Design a protein with these regions (language model features):
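H-loop/switch region of ABC-family ATPase nucleotide-binding domains
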Residues: 110-111
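Catalytic Walker B motif of ABC-type/P-loop ATPase nucleotide-binding domains
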Residues: 75-78
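Conserved signature/switch motifs of ABC ATPase nucleotide-binding domains
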Residues: 49-52, 70, 102
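A short, surface-exposed alpha-helical micro-motif characterized by mixed small hydrophobic
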Residues: 116-118
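Hydrophobic anchor residue at the start of the ABC signature
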Residues: 64
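Conserved ABC ATPase "signature" region
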Residues: 6, 10-14, 18-45
């Protein structure tokens, strides 16, 4: 997991003009940051594991740490829990909620409606590739304007 989180950052570091003279120092900085990110993801005990030794939720959290290592302005998630069983889904959603609490800007495509309502500052409801409705979680979830939005949300509120 540690090497996975470090890889992209190390490849980028090799393009720095002073890389050859600061190689060890740069490597140590990247490693320290990667360890910190894995700890933040709850994976301190899995740093030396390979992907085949990790659960789906753990692999997803390694991927989040790898993305964070590059210090992006925006993190994009496309159904981050769709391939996970319910127990592992909670682990990943907890990490994403923590990022939201730190005011990390994220775009999340999800069918986890309760999660979207609780974590989002802005919600967009799309149908057939088109934006049908957007607004605050309260506006979209509690007072939807569009019939299609109401129809979709009724599946989650009426059982």
């Amino acid at each position: 997991a540690l090497e996975n989180v470090m890889l992209a950052k190390e490849l980028l570091a090799k393009a720095q003009p002073d890389y050859k003279t600061r190689k060890k120092e740069i490597h140590n900085e990247i490693e320290t940051e990667a360890k910190s990110l894995l700890e933040q993801m709850g994976l301190a005990d899995r740093m030396n594991n390979y992907p085949h030794q990790l659960s789906g939720g753990q692999c997803q959290r390694v991927a989040i740490a790898r993305a964070l290592a590059l210090k992006p302005d925006i993190l994009c998630f496309d159904e981050p829990t769709s391939a996970l069983d319910p127990e592992l889904t909670g682990e990943v959603l907890k990490v994403i909620k923590g990022l939201a609490d730190q005011e990390t800007t994220m775009i999340i495509v999800t069918h986890e409606m309760a999660f979207a309502r609780d974590v989002s500052s802005h919600v967009i409801f799309m149908d057939d590739g088109c934006i049908l409705e957007q607004g605050t979680p309260s506006e979209v979830f509690e007072h939807p304007k569009e019939e299609r939005t109401r129809q979709f949300l009724s599946r989650f509120t009426n059982g």
